Amino acid sequence: MPVQHRTTVVGNTSTLKSPVGILRILEVIFACVTFSLVVHTGRWTGRIGDLCMFCWCFCFAVSLVILIVEFTGVQNRMPVSWKNFPITFAMYAVLMCLSATVIYPLQYLEDKAYSSEVRNYQIVAIVFSCLTTLAYIIEVSLTRAKPGEVTGYMATTPGLLKVLETFIACIIFVFISDPPLYDRHDALKWCLAVYCICFILSIVVIILCVGECTGWLPCAFNKFLSGYALLAVLMYASAMIIWPIFSFDRKHGGTASRPSNCRSSPGNLYAVCEWDKMVAVAVLTAVNLIAYVMDLVYSARLIFITV
């Protein structure tokens, strides 16, 4: 009789039993439950619903891929730096899931036309979205660089700030582009240039770190980071001054007070009146300026980095 050979699948189960591995399993489960409940209710149509659904599904898919890669032990074969990619994704996942957790109930729970059963499903989905966000927050806190630890740049405070800076810039682009709020004066176009240039440079830094391409730079990576952070602070400081002046000062064609016909939907980014959008851009500009100042301070203190 022919001898039958039993196929044994060997995997790195220790990664799944570690605190970070358990967190990633919970992230996959929580995200899956969240978008499954939302799909079951059928209450996610429109651009806002699509955005929330994309956040949950994207985080679920990438977390599952990370679990599979670490279980099979093929991190070294991946075309990305495994010291930088998981923490970068986890930070983006925190911001994406947090945004979806805030936006979804504002957009859909305020509608009283839904039955109590549908609302119950929506509430449970929001709870699981909160749990998903919390799991990613804990993962970031566990995997970020500790004092004195040599790790990937994206696990350091400046690396995490880069993720925050790009995410805030994306929100600014949403508010500033539909309708265009920068067409009224050339000074506002300068502000748009500031947001675009700093966003692109931050994305380039993230790509260089995740792709392990920092050696391509014509200068030392830490000097490039410090110089870029200083440039970003100066540019955002100018935007922080220029945007309010040319948006709210009547002498420069702005609107000082909120118009009486200004109506906004708190959960719909696309249904916010122009004046509220201008306020949001001013606030987000200030927040990003603070982030870049912190980035500059930490980058100046970061002496030795292994990417």
Curated annotation (Swiss-Prot):
- Keywords, ordered alphabetically: Membrane, Repeat, Transmembrane, Transmembrane helix
Q: Which InterPro entries match?
A: Marvel (IPR008253), MYADM-like (IPR047123)
Q: Which domain of life is it from?
A: Eukaryota
- Carries keyword Membrane? yes
User: Which subcellular locations apply to this protein?
Assistant: Membrane
Ranges that cross the membrane: 19-39, 51-71, 85-105, 123-143, 156-176, 190-210, 228-248, 278-298
Q: Where does the MARVEL domain lie?
A: 15-148, 153-304
Chief localization: membrane
The family note in this entry says: Belongs to the MAL family.
Quote the protein name from its UniProt record.
Myeloid-associated differentiation marker homolog
- Highest lineage ranks of the organism? Eukaryota, Metazoa, Chordata, Craniata, Vertebrata
